[in-house]
């Protein structure tokens, strides 16, 4: 039975200074969209668009008494804070498919943001739904349907000097990864959740989630948390040359991936691999 989820739509990265974050990620070799302002809220974002998914740098630009999730996260740290999954068709259809699996999705709700383009503001719109925390344990997530995809995927926003082309894997830490498996089998299906020596690996449809114990994740932060974002590059060698020329501190791992420390990316550990 299809669960109505077609992989990851985007990753939210919470930042304390949105403009400083923009400069930092441009230095890392990413092309950023113009700034978007969430309608009726004190939050704004810059997005890093790929062909099928993206990264969202999210921060405050005004006082917001309702954005408690972001406020609480930033009181502790910066970095990746949530995963948004993509619906296979639309949020309403995904809600029906999840309910048919015995899950408890919320009613889809609307969200819009004013995107500040040189020729004037446009309004990308989205349809969001949530699942109860116990149905996606150790993961802050929701489902985000793109209602106006052409507004946010302009060709010139999809090309990045560092050669990144998409999200490959989200690495997470949890106290007991094996205990998470039943919930994610219910969400994604038995054939898409695998126990590993280090924890649990989940096939979301076009990306992976990997949960590991703190001692195996290499993170100093308390679980549960996203510990690293693994991004796919067109050429690892070209990415290495770009990072060297930009003065970005990174190291090569034994498996060939390139690791950029959180200090270079607003609290986000980045892995670049083919």
Identify the function of each model-found stretch.
Residues 1-8, 13-32, 50-111, 115-274:
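Glyoxalase I/VOC metalloenzyme domain signal
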Residues 32-40:
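Conserved catalytic-core motifs of GNAT/GCN5-like acyltransferases
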Residues 40-44, 254-257:
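Short acidic/glycine-enriched loop/turn segments that link adjacent beta-strands
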Residues 47:
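Histidine-centered divalent-metal-coordination microenvironment in nucleic-acid enzymes
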């Amino acid at each position: 039975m299809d669960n109505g989820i077609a992989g990851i739509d985007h990753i939210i990265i919470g930042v304390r200074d949105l403009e400083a974050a923009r400069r930092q990620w441009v230095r890392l070799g990413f092309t950023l969209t113009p700034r978007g302002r969430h309608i009726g809220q004190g939050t704004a974002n810059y997005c890093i668009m790929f062909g099928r998914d993206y990264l969202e740098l999210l921060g405050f630009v005004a006082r917001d008494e309702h954005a408690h999730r972001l406020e609480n996260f930033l009181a502790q740290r910066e970095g990746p804070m949530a995963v948004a999954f993509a619906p296979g068709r639309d949020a309403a259809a995904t809600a029906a498919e999840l309910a048919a699996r015995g899950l408890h999705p919320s009613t889809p709700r609307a969200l819009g943001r004013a995107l500040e383009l040189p020729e004037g503001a446009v309004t990308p719109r989205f349809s969001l739904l949530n699942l109860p925390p116990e149905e996606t344990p150790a993961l802050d997530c929701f489902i985000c349907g793109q209602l106006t995809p052409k507004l946010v995927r302009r060709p010139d926003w999809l090309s990045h000097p560092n050669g990144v082309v998409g999200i490959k894997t989200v690495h997470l830490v949890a106290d007991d990864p094996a205990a998470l498996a039943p919930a994610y089998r219910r969400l994604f299906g038995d054939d898409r959740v695998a126990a590993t020596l280090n924890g649990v690996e989940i096939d979301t449809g076009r990306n992976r989630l990997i949960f590991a114990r703190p001692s195996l994740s290499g993170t100093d932060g308390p679980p549960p948390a996203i510990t690293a974002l693994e991004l796919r590059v067109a050429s690892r060698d070209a990415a290495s040359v770009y990072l060297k020329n930009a003065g970005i501190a990174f190291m090569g791992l034994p498996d060939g991936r390139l690791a950029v420390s959180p200090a270079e990316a607003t609290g986000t550990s980045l892995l670049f691999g083919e």
